[in-house]
Amino acid sequence: DRDDQQVIASAYQIAASAARHHLVLDYHGLKPFGIQRAYPNVLNFEGVKGLENSKWEPRVGDGPLHNQPRYDVTAPYLRMLAGPMDYTPGAMTNAMKDNFFGNNDHPMSQGTRVHQMAMYTTFEAPLQMLADSPTKYEREQPTTDFIRQIPTVFDEVRALDGVLGEYLVVAKRKGATWYLAAMTNWQPRDLTLTLDMLSAGSHEATLFADGVNADRDATDYRKT
């Protein structure tokens, strides 16, 4: 949680030692500063108001003090310019503004389940995380199976649409497979996208989207 000269020098020493021993690093609690150019074994950095902050987020008035969904569609435009981002996504307990509250024992996220799932494609994170309890992932097997098969590095990235603080749509290719994810703030929205990166002909897709009751139960989703 520091970035003074002593800490940065120490980070370089740790990275060099880890490289000699063929180890990779995730500098949690430290914002990116370009070290991965010299030491590509440094895979990720925190430097972001990530999911863990939900555990102690206070309520003010009719909702949480911090608007996390808006932050989630702001950080990729700004913070990710500096490098990969260890947000630690993957909450399986999800809540809308009206029923969200900070809780260390039973933490939850702001926004929908699919909002969390989309982070695994939209956020650059060569070393990715599953931040929730293992037993919750066992209970939510369709969600877990989908997250598990998303690559952490890609061959091609395209920004399809977005407005800072409002929404974003990203398509990423690994081999011959495209992964497309969209995230929004609290505002629901419909978008029309041009998928001209796909070859001519027919294509198969697995889709996850907010369910019809997601405005009341944020864990609700539909798979097609």
Say what each PLM segment does.
Residues 22-29, 52-57, 126-137, 154-158, ...:
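Acidic/polar loop patches that form or flank catalytic/metal-binding clefts of enzymes
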Residues 1-107:
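Aromatic- and carboxylate-enriched substrate-binding clefts and catalytic-loop regions
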Residues 114, 118-160:
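Catalytic cores of secreted or luminal carbohydrate-active enzymes
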Residues 25, 122, 180:
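Conserved, mostly hydrophobic/aromatic
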Residues 207-224:
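Solvent-exposed beta-strand/loop surfaces of large extracellular or lumenal domains
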Residues 164-203:
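Carbohydrate-binding surface patches
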Residues 1-4, 27-30, 47, 133, ...:
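Active-site proximal loops enriched in glycine and acidic residues that flank catalytic Cys/His/Asp
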Residues 2-6, 32-37, 94-96, 129-131, ...:
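Flexible loop/turn segments at secondary-structure boundaries
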